[in-house]
Amino acid sequence: MKVLFVYPRFQRHAQAHPELLEYVPMNEYLGSPSLGIAALAAVMPAHWELEFRDDRLTDAARPTDADLVALSFFTAAATRGLELADFFRAQGKPTVAGGLFTTAMPDVVLQHVDSVVVGEGEGAWLKLLQDFEAGGLQRRYERIPVDLTALPAPKVSLYIDGEGPSFHPDDYPVQLSRGCPLNCHSCILPVSMTKQLREFTLSQVVAQLDQLGAKGKRACLTEDTSWLPGKGNRLLESLFDHLIAQGKEATVSYVGISMPMILSTPIALLHKARRAGVTMFYLVGGFDPVTMRAFTGKDERQLERAHKAIAKCFEADIEPYTSFLYGQDDDDVGTVDRMLEFARASGIRKAEFAIFTPYPGTPSFARLEAEGRITSREWRRYNDANCVYQPKQLTAEQVTEGYLRLWREFYADKSYFQDRCHDERTIQF
């Protein structure tokens, strides 16, 4: 039997706002698909044949000889994902879907597919395959708990084998853990992966790094919450110790982290990360108390903490690639100036800017929908480049204008990026 996995395309920042290509002196960078499809492919029974289509590279809406079509998508790709589901069902193909949007809005997706997988996929996926082979698909499969330490490595070769001139990432994601005990207002992770922090073993992580290294790729550690103080730090420290001992300092490209995580992490661990080859932090902003308040003009303490977090990165010789989120309820017309001044004063060299987006399944979406402030359910617009709700102090037009100004003015004096090597002058926008 044969399954066709499909990763739907979505509108990127520079597609929504082509002027960004004029503002930013970098190459637009197409990153790897998320790990969902690769994780399911890894647990497929041996008698199943696999095919993968990345709709970002070539139009996936074409006939297939597969027995089953499986789509995985997050909110920004949901409009296209549902279009593709309709296409394959019209071709007479049983079609199923999973991913973050499906987990958040299963009833919406069920209008377009034969079956959905809600939540963490591997266990439910195997049950779905058993039912399909027996001729009796259920409409809905809920998460079945799995032991992470027993899972095989995601089959990222599906992605790497599809590389070409327009798609050749320098790195691919590697997970150290799943789940998160926090409840950030705009994050779906506790819903999709539960609030329990569960870890892979060090040997599993090292095996994934070695597989990528054999393909000439590095790992980016951005798909989990491993920098949470305590247990997660211990696994990270063990990984860094391994990389240093093995002389594999070029294995990890960058690591996802937040300002509170930086502030709570001992400087010795940051120095160890640098010795292990970590040269850049992807500094996620807008979800935590520091970055939600630092640029409001009303909280000097959080602004000071933000400066300390950036200074701590520089102290460890790790570049803070900083993500700024604009358009939240506490933001006003002066927030853009305050963000730009902070970036200048703190010495940030590389940044990205996004519009606050209340994703389905998050506390923010539920609250704003209850307040009648969601202004669009056109899911393709939920890509961090459009204002899809009504902020308290700004109009949607002001949010868009401020977002574009952030990109334009931050990169106005950074033409030197044009002369940098490939991995130094690429940015996903």
Language model features: what each stretch is:
Residues 224-228, 258-259, 326-330, 354-363:
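Short, solvent-exposed turn/loop segments enriched in Gly/Ser/Thr/Pro and often Arg
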Residues 96, 117, 140, 253-255, ...:
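Structural detector of well-ordered beta-strand residues that form the stable sheet scaffold
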